[in-house]
Swiss-Prot record:
Positions of disulphide bridges: 26-115, 28-44, 43-95, 49-122, 50-88, 57-81, 75-86
Keywords in alphabetical order: Disulfide bond, Hemostasis impairing toxin, Hydrolase, Lipid degradation, Lipid metabolism, Metal-binding, Platelet aggregation inhibiting toxin, Secreted, Toxin
E.C. number: 3.1.1.4
Organism: Craspedocephalus puniceus (Flat-nosed pitviper)
GO terms (BP aspect): arachidonate secretion; lipid catabolic process; negative regulation of T cell proliferation; phospholipid metabolic process
Protein name, UniProt field: Acidic phospholipase A2 Tpu-E6b
Top-level taxon of the source organism: Eukaryota
InterPro entries recorded: PLipase_A2 (IPR001211), PLipase_A2_Asp_AS (IPR033112), PLipase_A2_dom (IPR016090), PLipase_A2_dom_sf (IPR036444), PLipase_A2_His_AS (IPR033113)
Length: 122
């Protein structure tokens, strides 16, 4: 679920996903189009693609089971569909953490009018 994703980002990256990535670049937040603007925005692009491949459950609403210790996440889900959601969220949280140094404030609340280039395929 998106609520779990927020918590996971806090545990892995040490920052709020909603605050830092809720409306960032062309892909972080609702929707997504154009080209990712930087590495952090690409994390969101890849996460959107990952969610798009999930079949049989709802990535935004369905809950999964995971554990976290010292920033390491283990998806402990028996259901293959919700485990896939957990793995998508885990990869994005790690991506945010690993690319914090490329985060640029100019892409925070980036106007969608600048996201008009043709999107690349997932």
């Amino acid at each position: 679920s998106l609520m779990q994703f927020e918590t996971m980002i806090m545990k892995v990256a040490g920052r709020s996903g909603v605050w830092w990535y809720g409306s960032y670049g062309c892909y972080c937040g609702k929707g997504g189009q154009g080209q990712p603007q930087d590495a952090s925005d690409r994390c969101c692009f890849v996460h959107d693609c990952c969610y798009g491949k999930v079949n049989g459950c709802d990535p935004k609403d369905d809950f999964y089971t995971y554990s976290s210790e010292n920033g390491d996440v283990v998806c402990e889900e028996d259901n293959p569909c919700t485990k896939e959601i957990c793995e998508c969220d885990k990869a994005a949280a790690i991506c945010f953490r690993d690319n914090m140094d490329t985060y640029q404030n100019k892409y925070w609340f980036y106007p969608t009018k600048y996201c008009k280039e043709e999107s690349e395929p997932c």
